[in-house]
From Swiss-Prot:
It is a multi-pass membrane protein. SUPFAM superfamilies: Nucleotide-diphospho-sugar transferases. Pathway: Glycolipid biosynthesis; 4-amino-4-deoxy-alpha-L-arabinose undecaprenyl phosphate biosynthesis; 4-amino-4-deoxy-alpha-L-arabinose undecaprenyl phosphate from UDP-4-deoxy-4-formamido-beta-L-arabinose and undecaprenyl phosphate: step 1/2; Bacterial outer membrane biogenesis; lipopolysaccharide biosynthesis. This is Undecaprenyl-phosphate 4-deoxy-4-formamido-L-arabinose transferase. One of its GO terms (molecular function) is undecaprenyl-phosphate 4-deoxy-4-formamido-L-arabinose transferase activity. It comes from Pectobacterium carotovorum subsp. carotovorum (strain PC1). GO terms for biological process: 4-amino-4-deoxy-alpha-L-arabinopyranosyl undecaprenyl phosphate biosynthetic process; lipid A biosynthetic process; lipopolysaccharide biosynthetic process; response to antibiotic.
Amino acid sequence: MIDDIKNVSVVIPVYNEEESLPVLIERTLAACRQIGKPWEIILVDDGSSDRSAELLTEAASDPEKHIIAVLLNRNYGQHSAIMAGFQQAVGDVVITLDADLQNPPEEIPRLVEYAAQGYDVVGTVRANRQDSLFRKLASKTINMMIRRSTGKSMADYGCMLRAYRRHIVSAMLHCHERSTFIPILANTFARKTIEIDVMHAEREFGTSKYSFLKLINLMYDLLTCLTTTPLRILSLIGSVVALSGFLLALLLIGLRLFLGAEWAAEGVFTLFAVLFMFIGAQFVGMGLLGEYIGRIYTDVRARPRYFVQKTVSAATPLTTSLRDEEE
């Protein structure tokens, strides 16, 4: 066993989770105390409109809890909030966890144990998943499309309960693209990975922040920001459509010659239908190209992916000790 882990950071993005926060903090603290190593909990408020930021500030003011509250000025999205937490984290292993308590914080010590065996990334698979049938089907579809498009073989990309070694986190922080999906990005740099089954519970507090439209947008973002496979597929489809159009044109010319101009006039609507199909395919292609160009434009502007409005912490022994060692 390779155990070079001196300390652990836990990063939790929070968005409108005031109902679950007291229980989340209590259970996460209890889990971290079982690690047997110095630890810190970084709670990132992603522009919540409820009392989440207030509760995080209150928790971070207690020096006994080892909590750092990072407050973003507005909502930037789950993965940007996690990157903000990574920027604050100093642990040799960094654990990410959702705030909805569907994945129990009690799994944290087990993830640290696997990371201590030398794995760069410890992924998780939700066993006996308690989501609705729609969410399960949507998740399976997204996972399948990601695996086929990116070539990154993972069973459950949607589960954010994961462990990352320090060098993986550092590598991700050097990536400045605006659209980021952390599990895939981490696997890009990881040499040794593993996936383990973890428990999954029903959501007790609040509602899911991922609606149907957000899931569709997420799938589209993943396919366009992480791979050029859609462009290659589009080129293949364009070639097939062009060849089909050429063959159809030859067929129409032949039928006109053998059956006369009268038949050709009666086939105008068929021709229009085929034309509209080709025009529709062109618009789909233009939209996809526009999405890629828009992402290039966004990345070229190099605007920050988030803005930290305030950081609150009453106890920072982990950060202080690490900085002293580096100096």
